[in-house]
C-alpha cells in the first residue's frame, strides 16, 4: 500500500509548534485509518487467528500502545496476545516457533531494539508483522505483512498522533479477529468525534489551568486500572518527556504495595476514571491518595467529589484509550511551555532511537 503524503501538511500551518499541530491532527488520522486500513487490518487479524502464540513488541510509547492491545484482544476477542518491551524480547524469545506471530509497533520503523528482536524472531522461523508509520523503513520492508499507520510525518520528538493511530489499529484488529471489524471502526469514529470536541478552546483552557497547578511540581503520579493502566503509563511518559516533571504511572491496585509512601501534601495525582468495571475501585484509590494529601486530577466522563480538578472525556467504551491520551499530551505540553521548555525538542531525546 502506498501512502500519499500531502506535503502542505509538513509545515506548521499556523500552529506554534509541531506538538500542538500533531495533537490536533489526531481526529483526522483516526478517520483515515477507518477509511483506508481495513484490508491490512483484516490480513493481520487472519494471521493472529492462524498463529499458535502471538507476541507484540514496542519501545517507549509504542510499547504502551502494544500493552493496550493485549487488554483489547482479551476483552474483545477473548484471545491472549502477549506483550513484551522490544528491548527485552531477545532475552526470552527461545519459545518462538514457525507457528508464532511477532507483531512490532514502531513510528519510524528504524528502532534498533525492535529490528534486533525481529531478526531473532525471523531466525526462529516465526511470521513477522509490523504496524508502522514509515512503510519503506527497515521494519516495513522486513515483515511478512504490514499495517500502515497513515499518520503522516511526525516531526515532534514526542509521539502523539502515531500513538493513537497504533491504539486505533489494535482496537479494530481485535474486533476483526472477532469478526466485528465494523463495530471497531464505529468506535474509532466515535473517538475521533470526541477528540475533535475536546480540541475546542473551552476544553483546552481547562487543561491549561490544570497545567498551571502542576508546573512547579517535583513529582507527579498517574494511576489507572484495566484498560486504563497502559494509558497511565503512556500519560506519565508524555508528561515527563516534555515537562521534565518526574512523572510515574502505576496500576491503581498497586498503590498500597509501596507507591503510596511517596504521596505528600500537594502531590499531583492524575486519576483515570472511565465508565467501566474499574470505576468504583479507581475512585477508592483516588480517595486513598487524597487522604494522604494528594491533589487529585480526574480524567473521565463524569466528575466526582474526590477530584480537585477534572478534565472531561467522552464516554466511548472500549475506545477510551483513544480519548484518554489527549489530556495527558496537552497537560504535559502546557506544563512544558509554562516551564520554558521547547515541546518539539526535549533534552536528551531523539525521534528515532537507531542505536542500542
Model-derived features with residue positions:
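Internal helix-turn-beta structural module
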Residues: 315-343
Amino acid at each position: 500500500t502506498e501512502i500519499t503524503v500531502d506535503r502542505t501538511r509538513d509545515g506548521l500551518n499556523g500552529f506554534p509548534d509541531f506538538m500542538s499541530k500533531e495533537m490536533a491532527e489526531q481526529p483526522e488520522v483516526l478517520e483515515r485509518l477507518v477509511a483506508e486500513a481495513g484490508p491490512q487490518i483484516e490480513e493481520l487479524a487472519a494471521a493472529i487467528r492462524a498463529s499458535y502464540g502471538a507476541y507484540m513488541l514496542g519501545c517507549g510509547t509504542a510499547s504502551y500502545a502494544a500493552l493496550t492491545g493485549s487488554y483489547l484482544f482479551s476483552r474483545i476477542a477473548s484471545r491472549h496476545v502477549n506483550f513484551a518491551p522490544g528491548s527485552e524480547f531477545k532475552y526470552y524469545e527461545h519459545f518462538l516457533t514457525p507457528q508464532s506471530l511477532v507483531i512490532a509497533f514502531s513510528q519510524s520503523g528504524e528502532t534498533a531494539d525492535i529490528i534486533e528482536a525481529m531478526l531473532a524472531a525471523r531466525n526462529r522461523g516465526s511470521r513477522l508483522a509490523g504496524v508502522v508509520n514509515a512503510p519503506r523503513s527497515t521494519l516495513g520492508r522486513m515483515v511478512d505483512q504490514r499495517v500502515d499507520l497513515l499518520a503522516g510525518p511526525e516531526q515532534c520528538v514526542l509521539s502523539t498522533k502515531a500513538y493513537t493511530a497504533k491504539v486505533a489499529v489494535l482496537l479494530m484488529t481485535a474486533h476483526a479477529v472477532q469478526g466485528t471489524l465494523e463495530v471497531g471502526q464505529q468506535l474509532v469514529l466515535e473517538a475521533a468525534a470526541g477528540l475533535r470536541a475536546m480540541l475546542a478552546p473551552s476544553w483546552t483552557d481547562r487543561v491549561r489551568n490544570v497545567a498551571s497547578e502542576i508546573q512547579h511540581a517535583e513529582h507527579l503520579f498517574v494511576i489507572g486500572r484495566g484498560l486504563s493502566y497502559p494509558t497511565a503509563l503512556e500519560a506519565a511518559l508524555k508528561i515527563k518527556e516534555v515537562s521534565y516533571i518526574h512523572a510515574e504511572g502505576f496500576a491503581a491496585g498497586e498503590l498500597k504495595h509501596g507507591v503510596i509512601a511517596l504521596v505528600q501534601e500537594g502531590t499531583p495525582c492524575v486519576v483515570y476514571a472511565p465508565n467501566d468495571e474499574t470505576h468504583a475501585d479507581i475512585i477508592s484509590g483516588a480517595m486513598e491518595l487524597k487522604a494522604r494529601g494528594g491533589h487529585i486530577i480526574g480524567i473521565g466522563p463524569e466528575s466526582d467529589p474526590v477530584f480537585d480538578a477534572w478534565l472531561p472525556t467522552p464516554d466511548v467504551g472500549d475506545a477510551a484509550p483513544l480519548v484518554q491520551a489527549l489530556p495527558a499530551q496537552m497537560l504535559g505540553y502546557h506544563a512544558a511551555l509554562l516551564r520554558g521548555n521547547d515541546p518539539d525538542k526535549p533534552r536528551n531525546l531523539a525521534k528515532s532511537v537507531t542505536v542500542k
